[in-house]
């Protein structure tokens, strides 16, 4: 059996020589315990060798941390695990998003092991963290054992910090040192924080917001305590949002500037140029809306606008307040804010700049609804507070805390001249003078005392006994003046099952009990006794009575120590049995009792059991003499202390609560539910130690700090590395609460048979717990959980666990959050049972909205905003559906919609290509230009995605083949109809590129004539159609990737794409088909080929010659085509439901006939799914303990002028695997001239609606009147399209279209949808080519926001972060400068000449104004003075092809490293080639492969491009701002037979 051993090392590393191995030497050397380890096998005979035994330590950080020389003498001692078990272990990590599920698994891995300081921990070979601190008994130790009671806290050194600086009245006050409080914030506090981040290399992102509350009441009235100001408005000034640490010096400058102007901006209102009015006044911190600021910051975590940052963990809200930690709040706001924040994982901390007061903090004052005139004090459990600048002098010695600013600011000569009045202290009403207390005390000792105790007082005692702590009551409440006791009797009690009317208890005839023969100590005792019953029994009224003397005490231990009273193991005394004791009790007649409590406290007598008898008219309670003697001395001392005015012992709560008001009686559930969010206290200045411990421990965050931590001191550990929400908690409702305050739901989950080998029962149990931990649940532990489980009929408290072992059968796990309790159990048959308790919200409180005035980072004035309240997603999540999805059941994709807890979206944009152009093909003689390199890069990405795809189909190998991408230029509808017209057989729904039924009818011995016939057959062949691409038309051609797929599906001896490509090259050698320009061999991709004339049949699907020659004249928009023509395109193609559209479309159309037998058909729109989803295994090497999968959505139809989209969705996957996968994608994209940019899920307008702190840049568009100098036909175009100017400006600054608006997808006969849902963007969205900015055109404005996701992803080094931020701000300033000067806009638009006959070659399809064939502008691509290197923008006519075989792709593409080294360093740029239809991607900025600058010919002059190329039709002149070399070798002249077919591109 394993034991725990301790290594004791010499304090100074003493080394003993060989001849001094005697016992005397052992005594001279002092040892300290440094290292603990698990000794699995300890052999006794090893001790006989004494000093000959050697201990070896592996090299590494442990050896260096010990600092012990080799061959030093050590001692090894066996220790019990409990002796060396740590209380708290802190584990730190950085640069990764670590979910709480992964924290749970790391905690399970470390259980029953020993750790030491700076020990490195590797989890799943991808997550790396280290042990930062180990605490035992409140002190740091070097090493310890992690046992079942050890709390493990995870701290992140890369978090998101939200700093809210409260600018209240006190902010402008001077301190005693003469420094303004705000200057102390920005000169001391914030620099200290940022300096720690920089020294420890922490990578936090910080958001700084200035906040204040302003009262708009014109009458300046001094607000009293508890009085709220009228017409209060909250102002927020966003200084910076999610910036890096490297810019903290600029932040300090910005903060000082904003502080100087903040008061002026919020207090003044300009009505005219010469009239400015001062309005309102800034409120002090105690009157400010601090809850609104905290809730608004916490809402960012659960906002729909939140995007998962894979490099940062935890969100910490830090409120810097000039006050002392006291705030007046409204009850409704306190309740809702506490409820919401208690259900989140956000840490909230307040740093006060003033000195710590002498009372408990943070202190919230509120008026309850039932008593609106009475203030109550409470300490919230979800806020931590600290005070900056308090030295040991202030903590160890008393200094005045009272601050009267008017007196402090007086001069020496002003003391006698100024009339400063200070209100007298309010004399407490109802309090007695000290002399009266003395008289009452004397009367209690030397004379009979009359006290009448009502049943309400007794019921209050019962209520107080049910709680864990008892508040201190004033001494006056101990002496009730309601009546008198004329004589005392022995105690009696009765329990009544029916609640009788209310009555009081009167006791007479004082007689000493037999046990009271000794001298009397005190004559005053008023303890109450009550019946005890089980929770399952019916509610009964407690029996109450008074006792006669101190000696006749009821059988109840006043001390209620944990050793004597344990609520979970106590015995239950029923009211059915009666046992009389030796003392003869006097019978007291008592009237029926009114108050009724459902459950009496379960208290157990210490020595003997008092028994209760039932009687309708009297009660009997008896006590043994032993009990009376035992409690005599201790009780008399407590009573004397209470009468003399000294504080009572905090354990003796019964006597103090005897006369509590009956109105304060609550059920068992109300205080407990409230205490989960805050603790009410009666006297903040005189709080007991127990109450303070309850405040510190009764919180979800109570295990974050070690024992004996000073609560008020500045916690630099928290500011440097915020802690994640602890995994375990002891907060749990009682049985009565679960029965009355919660709704119940139960269901069973069984594992799918297909998942048994993949996941297993143990894995399913673990995943169900893990996903709840990720949603903010905590593992419930403690006595309450065991007690609740024991009350179940089939309860097994011993089966409750927090660590799921390999044998999960029979285990039970409880998880809890603010409003839910989940019980997950696994029976011995493998069935998972889930029981969910939803808290019933009985409080009638409306959800508050955020009605604020905010000024964002780039705004110039405050604007009024109304943000909706946030809600935790755990309430909305369908746990039943989600758990079944984890078990392998996903019917109709419904579970997939519910389980998308985390989403991430990236796009691919062309970038500068400076590396090798090796595509990895076998034929090294092929020459590829930059566009083809990017084409192949996209193919490799898709190939890598599908290489590790997960499929349940029988043919799993085919599922790993990437699907074909479809590219189009022009209108999307025209492209879809072209596919249908070219091959109507695709509408039959029997063809699918991925899972098509194999028809292996042929082999390689087929005759060429037969092969040509089969290829061109209407059914079963491939598509032959006239392809128009980049001003040219190629008749009767097919695409290489279609032919590869057809060969694999129809040839019995061809199974892979490589075999298909090799066979295709053999056919080319036999002159079966050729490349349309004889430039390439047969390749798998978007390359055009034509059959030889002897094998080609008549192109029946080709359009007439007159239509070919007039492409732009015949081009129609579906929005303008009549319904007859539109329906005619599909007439006769199909009259039944359509299930698939080719190999990439998902179509559905319903055809029906009218009842009057008419021939007219009613056709519903076709549904086209333009994207496809695939589930990918991110851990093919099986490093993780579970399957690591992610659902990836990718485009199937793509316009090269737009971004190529990838969307990642996962529920319970380790984020580090996703981050590594995206990093591999990024490296692959860089090799092939593509840039991976991470974008938010929501559009810009939606982000601004949900995130009040988001940076917003608004640019007003110039009007047509300001552009009056432009040619008439240009003005006519801009008048017809209101968004054309905005599009041209965005193109000018290098923006690329990201996603079209929802209205652009609403086509006449086609309904567009994605694999993740229907498009929901209200406006078209653009992204800057480097991913720094995102823009939308809303009305007559351009709205932009910084892309913080991409900025934070690329900001690895500080220099890089500064460069990216500067570049983004440079673009913003240039755009603002341009928009402020209409003549600059006019000059920019005037540089492009547009002839009326010119084709709109550069207009993006689907955008506003592109439906009618209206001429559109082609803009110049060079942006003045900003681009340092040739830049790229995707054009509308770019071809990108997929890849079937992946050589690295997302996994790193290690095979291409050798080829990448062959890059030509002399490449400066690449020309655009107009022949992309022959396998060359036209993306608008082609870097030159070879330097042939001097070989430019007139035939290729139209192909010259700048760094950002926009295709320009004939007759359009472009003023070049940058010399770009043209590569003549990239595009030879078209063949003579094709020159006559050159036409202008449609788009």
UniProtKB/Swiss-Prot annotation:
Keywords: Membrane, Vacuole. Residues 608-618 have a biased composition (Polar residues). Residues 1451-1464, 1482-1494 have a biased composition (Acidic residues). Gene3D superfamilies: Winged helix-like DNA-binding domain superfamily/Winged helix DNA-binding domain. It is a peripheral membrane protein. The keyword NADP does not apply. Residues 1018-1093 form the DEP domain. One of its GO terms (biological process) is negative regulation of TORC1 signaling. It comes from the Eukaryota. The keyword Membrane applies. SMART domains: DEP (SM00049). It is found in: Vacuole membrane. Disulfide bonds: none annotated. SUPFAM superfamilies: Winged helix' DNA-binding domain. GO terms for molecular function: GTPase activator activity. One of its GO terms (cellular component) is GATOR1 complex. Residues 489-517, 597-632, 1393-1547 are annotated as: Disordered. Pfam families: DEP (PF00610), DEPDC5_CTD (PF19418), IML1 (PF12257). InterPro entries: DEP_dom (IPR000591), DEPDC5_CTD (IPR045838), IML1 (IPR027244), IML1_N (IPR048255), WH-like_DNA-bd_sf (IPR036388), WH_DNA-bd_sf (IPR036390). Residues 1419-1450, 1495-1547 have a biased composition (Basic and acidic residues). Belongs to the IML1 family. This is Vacuolar membrane-associated protein IML1. The gene is IML1.
